[in-house]
């Protein structure tokens, strides 16, 4: 089909029929009176990707300090009672634990991707630990 040059045309104004304007106005006003505006929702996966980028940029500890400290004390009681911890010792344990978990989740994600999945499963964690030689 040949392309034609568009030229400006002068509009020949005139009044639109009253019935058409009335129906347009009725259509515009109808949904606003009875309808409640739905809250905005992002598409599935958008927020997850945003969180991934946020946590990959950050360096702060992700596990809360007090619950981790209680866990350390609870585990330490099995070996020796009345143990005391310096605050720096608990922080060092937390840094090491989080570094280990991040690495484990990276390997777990690779196992899931290898299985042509995007969701990690317990079997991926088990495989990652088995390959690392942590659990025979």
From Swiss-Prot:
Task: List modified residues, type N6-methyllysine.
Answer: 5, 10, 24, 28, 37
Expressing tissues: Expressed in roots, seedlings, leaves and open flowers.
Instruction: Please state the protein's primary subcellular location.
Output: nucleus
Give the record's family classification: Belongs to the histone H3 family.
Please give the residue positions where the record annotates the modification N6,N6-dimethyllysine: 5, 10, 28, 37
Q: Which residues carry this modification: N6-acetyllysine?
A: 10, 15, 24
One of the Pfam families matching this protein, by short name = Histone
Q: Provide ranges: composition bias, Basic residues.
A: 1-15
Q: Which InterPro entries has this protein been placed in?
A: Histone-fold, Histone_H2A/H2B/H3, Histone_H3/CENP-A
Subunit annotation: The nucleosome is a histone octamer containing two molecules each of H2A, H2B, H3 and H4 assembled in one H3-H4 heterotetramer and two H2A-H2B heterodimers. The octamer wraps approximately 147 bp of DNA.
Q: Which organism is it from?
A: Arabidopsis thaliana
Give the SMART domains listed for this entry.
H3 (SM00428)
Q: Which residues carry this modification: Phosphoserine?
A: 11, 29
Keyword list (alphabetical) reads: Acetylation, Chromosome, DNA-binding, Methylation, Nucleosome core, Nucleus, Phosphoprotein
Task: Describe the task this protein carries out.
Answer: Core component of nucleosome. Nucleosomes wrap and compact DNA into chromatin, limiting DNA accessibility to the cellular machineries which require DNA as a template. Histones thereby play a central role in transcription regulation, DNA repair, DNA replication and chromosomal stability. DNA accessibility is regulated via a complex set of post-translational modifications of histones, also called histone code, and nucleosome remodeling.
Q: What is this protein called?
A: Histone H3-like 3
Key word Repeat present: no
In this UniProt entry, the residues modified to N6,N6,N6-trimethyllysine are: 5, 10, 28, 37
Quote the subcellular location field of this record: Nucleus; Chromosome
Q: Which CDD domains match?
A: HFD_H3
Give me the ranges of the annotated region Disordered: 1-42
Q: Which GO terms describe its molecular function?
A: DNA binding; protein heterodimerization activity; structural constituent of chromatin
One GO cellular component assignment for this chain's record is: nucleus
């Amino acid at each position: 089909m040949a392309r034609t040059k568009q030229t400006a045309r002068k509009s020949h104004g005139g009044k639109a029929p009253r019935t058409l304007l009335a129906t347009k106005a009725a259509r515009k006003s109808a949904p606003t009176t009875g309808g409640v505006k739905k809250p905005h929702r992002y598409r599935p996966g958008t927020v997850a990707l945003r969180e991934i980028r946020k946590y990959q940029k950050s360096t702060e500890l992700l596990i809360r300090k007090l619950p981790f400290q209680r866990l350390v004390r609870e585990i330490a009681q099995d070996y020796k009672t009345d143990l005391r911890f310096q605050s720096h010792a608990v922080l060092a344990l937390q840094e090491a634990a989080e570094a280990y978990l991040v690495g484990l989740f990276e390997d777990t994600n690779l196992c899931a991707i290898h299985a042509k999945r995007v969701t990690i499963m317990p079997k991926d964690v088990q495989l990652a630990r088995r390959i690392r030689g942590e659990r025979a």
